[in-house]
């Protein structure tokens, strides 16, 4: 796979209306983009922007299922402080753990129909595996930003709440390290993100 990912970012603008008066100044509703590698769409690319003026993300609860000997979803982005439930929906035991970087944990062996919970209290990437089934892998990226997007199977992503301006960005995809840089958000701008 080409180690350069091109992320085309285009702004979606909305106009706020004040009653029957003329439209107010346009405000950015979302930053829409596409992740591409080797001319093909790339899924599971995570991009987040540092914006001190943006509201802090709220802690939430998420679920990463163990189903058909896979984790679903494979990539999850969660605000720091969020709790992830890891239910065993398979017909076999699993032993979910993360030993490197991010949140370190070992949930031990647990049977079908039960769940374990992990709170991701620090920012960073946690690689999650099953001690019994080595082909099972998932990733939880805990971030301190509310401006985050994850590309879908078509490479499309949306960062809700982004406004025009200059940002520090961070980007990651499975199999690569986190890269960082700065970008200016403006209509029709294309950004090239290259992993070393």
Predicted regions and their residues:
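Extended interaction regions within the primary functional domain
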Residues: 1, 16, 193-195
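Bacterial N-terminal signal peptides that target proteins for export
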Residues: 1-9
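Bacterial N-terminal signal peptides
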Residues: 8-18
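Extracytoplasmic copper-binding redox domains, predominantly the cupredoxin/blue-copper superfamily
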Residues: 23-196
């Amino acid at each position: 796979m080409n180690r350069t990912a091109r992320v085309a970012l285009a702004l979606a603008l909305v106009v706020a209306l004040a009653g029957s008066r003329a439209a107010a100044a346009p405000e950015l509703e979302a930053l829409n983009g596409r992740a591409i590698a080797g001319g093909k769409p790339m899924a599971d690319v995570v991009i987040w922007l540092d914006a001190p003026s943006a509201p802090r993300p709220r802690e939430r609860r998420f679920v990463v299922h163990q189903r058909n000997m896979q984790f679903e979803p494979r990539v999850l982005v969660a605000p720091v402080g969020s709790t992830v439930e890891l239910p065993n929906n398979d017909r076999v035991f699993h032993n979910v753990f993360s030993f490197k970087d991010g949140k370190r944990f070992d949930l031990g062996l647990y049977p079908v129909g039960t769940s374990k919970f992990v709170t991701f209290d620090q920012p960073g990437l946690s690689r999650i595996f099953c001690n019994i089934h080595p082909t099972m892998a998932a990733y939880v990226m805990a971030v301190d930003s509310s401006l985050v997007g994850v590309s879908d199977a078509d490479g499309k992503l949306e960062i809700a709440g982004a406004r025009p301006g200059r940002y520090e960005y961070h980007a990651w995809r499975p199999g690569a390290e986190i890269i960082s840089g700065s970008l200016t958000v403006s209509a029709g701008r294309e950004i090239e993100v290259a992993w070393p």
